[in-house]
């Protein structure tokens, strides 16, 4: 988390905004079937969209380059202990706390593990507002990546329990 925090502190700016809701809809539009495999998908999607008005109040001028795909496999450590962050295909301008949420959901963290991750990132000092935003991003990210998985499944690519885990975050935190 120290390396991710250091990266965020550079406050790099760019032109592309990674829009979570747009990307969620994009992957849904790629499905060959017209309905999700999850029976309660429409209900969960509505709950996730209820978070949007609050998340939309975040000042986009404060967005900086976020990795978006901060999965543990994308943190490479050399023999000398130097850490590199690789695989930038999803990177874009976004609230930095999206990276914390994505790290937690990619790794299948429980709420307790996510809380520990947040404490590490903030050295124990995270405001309630930021904590809530991270949880909201877990919900949106969970639905986004479960939609991505459904698209991939249409192509014959399967991910074991990963889609259900992602969908579970959308259900739990929305």
Name each model feature, range by range.
Residues 8-12, 59, 104, 125:
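Protein kinase-like catalytic domain
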Residues 9-12, 26-36, 143-158:
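A glycine-centered beta->alpha junction motif in the catalytic cores
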Residues 12-68, 80:
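An alpha-helical support segment within catalytic cores of ATP-dependent transferases
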Residues 69, 87:
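Conserved catalytic-loop position in the HRD/HxD motif
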Residues 97-126, 139-157, 169:
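Active-site activation/catalytic loop segments of kinase-like enzymes and analogous catalytic loops
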Residues 170-174:
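Regulatory N- and C-terminal appendages and interdomain linkers associated
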């Amino acid at each position: 988390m120290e390396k991710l925090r250091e990266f965020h502190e550079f406050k790099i700016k760019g032109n592309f905004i990674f829009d979570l809701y747009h990307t969620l809809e994009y992957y849904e539009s790629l499905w060959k079937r017209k309905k999700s495999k999850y029976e309660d998908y429409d209900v969960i999607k509505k709950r996730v969209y209820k978070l949007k008005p609050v998340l939309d109040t975040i000042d986009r001028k404060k967005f900086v380059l976020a990795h978006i795909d901060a999965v543990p496999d994308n943190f490479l450590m050399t023999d000398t202990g130097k850490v590199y962050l690789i695989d930038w295909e999803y990177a874009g301008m976004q609230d930095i706390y999206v990276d914390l949420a994505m790290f937690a959901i990619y790794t299948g963290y429980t709420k307790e593990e996510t809380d520990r991750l947040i404490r590490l990132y903030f050295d124990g000092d995270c405001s309630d507002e930021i904590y809530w935003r991270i949880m909201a991003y877990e919900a949106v990210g969970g639905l986004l990546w479960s939609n991505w998985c459904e698209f991939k499944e249409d192509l014959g690519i399967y991910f074991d329990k990963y889609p259900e885990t992602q969908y579970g975050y959308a259900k739990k935190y929305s």
